[in-house]
Amino acid sequence: MNKLSTKLVVAIGIGAALYGILGLWGFSIAPNTFIKPALAILTVFGALFGPVAGLLIGLIGHTVTDTIAGWGIWWGWVISSGIIGFAMGFIQKRVGFSVKNGTYNKGDISYLAITGLIGIVIAIIFAGAFDIIVMGEPFDKIVIQVLGATIADVIVFLVLGLPITIGLAKSNKKHAHLKIEK
C-alpha cells in the first residue's frame, strides 16, 4: 500500500479546511442549492496534488461544511464532492503537466476541462440518486437540485477553478526568454 507523504497529508488538511469553511458561503439558485466558490479549491488542490488528495479534500471538507452548518451530514453530497475532487486530480497524473513547475500545454487544459466537467456531472447525478434512493427525498425536488447544482458547479469550475489553476501554472512557469550576454 502506498503511504501518504507528510506534504500530501498537510495539503489534504489545508485543502479540506479551506473547502470546508469556504463551503459555508454561496449564492442560492434552487432549493438547498447554491453557487459555492469553494469548488475552485477542489480544482486547484486536485491539479496540484492528484486524485487521492482531491477525493479526501472533497470528502473531509464537505463533511466539515455540513457539520458546522448544522443541517446534518448529507452523505450523497459529501461523496459527490469527493468524486469531483478525484476527477479534478486526474490532470496531475498527465506526463509533462505540473502546476508547481508551470509546465502544461493546451491539451492539458482541455483534459482538465473535460475530466472536470465529466466528474461534476457524474458526482451530481450520484448525489441526486443517493438522495432519492437512500434518503427518500422527492424526485421533483431532486431534479431541480441536480440541475441547479450541475449548472452552479460548472460555472464555478469554468469561471474560477480552471482560470486560477492556469494562472498558478503560468506564474510558476520557468521563463527561457533570457539570453546570456558574452
Swiss-Prot record:
Pfam families: ECF-ribofla_trS (PF07155). One of its GO terms (cellular component) is plasma membrane. This is UPF0397 protein BCQ_2505. Keywords: Cell membrane, Membrane, Transmembrane, Transmembrane helix. Its main location: membrane. The lineage of its organism: Bacteria, Bacillati, Bacillota, Bacilli, Bacillales. The keyword Cell membrane applies. It comes from the Bacteria. The keyword Transmembrane helix applies. Belongs to the UPF0397 family. The chain crosses the membrane at residues 9-29, 40-60, 71-91, 114-134, 142-162.
